[in-house]
């Protein structure tokens, strides 16, 4: 779906109205997350703490987008300066700390493969973004977080029920 050219894709992404693909993607993702999280809460002791680990880990993985891709729009078109500015070493250190600290607090070996798969998903998304729009936008940042989090939960669920 969407546009065939980079310019058309960016134009569609700038439109604040949600389309059929957006609605369908959100509904399918939330239904999938609901079912996977429900299954994990029943299968894992302390399953309620899972989002305390998964959320920061996946935000850390998806935030690495700024290290792999340039901002796709002109800086003057960005709504938030933070989106197109590369983080400093202090901000990177904070991102790592806030991403890894909860995982270290509730460490389980069963989180390693899901985290690796979430990182692989993020890298695949970055490759698609590079090919389609030669960079990223704020929408891309949000989508990469949602997808990496879903991949984390799905992988963990598959490991529990395999």
Provide a role label for each language-model segment:
Residues 1-20:
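Aspartate-rich (DDxxD/NDxxD/DxxxD) Mg2+/diphosphate-binding motifs
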Residues 5, 21-162:
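Hydrophobic alpha-helical transmembrane segments
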């Amino acid at each position: 779906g969407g546009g065939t050219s980079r310019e058309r894709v960016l134009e569609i992404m700038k439109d604040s109205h949600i389309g059929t693909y957006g609605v369908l993607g959100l509904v399918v993702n939330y239904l999938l997350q609901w079912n996977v999280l429900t299954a994990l809460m029943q299968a894992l002791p302390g399953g309620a703490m899972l989002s305390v680990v998964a959320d920061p880990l996946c935000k850390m993985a998806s935030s690495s987008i700024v290290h792999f891709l340039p901002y796709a729009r002109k800086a003057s078109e960005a709504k938030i300066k933070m989106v197109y500015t590369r983080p400093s070493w202090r901000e990177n250190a904070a991102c790592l700390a806030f991403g890894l600290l909860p995982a270290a607090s509730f460490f389980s070996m069963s989180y390693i493969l899901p985290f690796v798969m979430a990182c692989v998903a993020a890298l695949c998304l970055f490759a698609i973004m590079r090919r389609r729009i030669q960079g990223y936008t704020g929408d891309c940042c949000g989508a990469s977080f949602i997808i990496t989090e879903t991949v984390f939960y799905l992988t963990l669920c598959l490991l529990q029920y395999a």
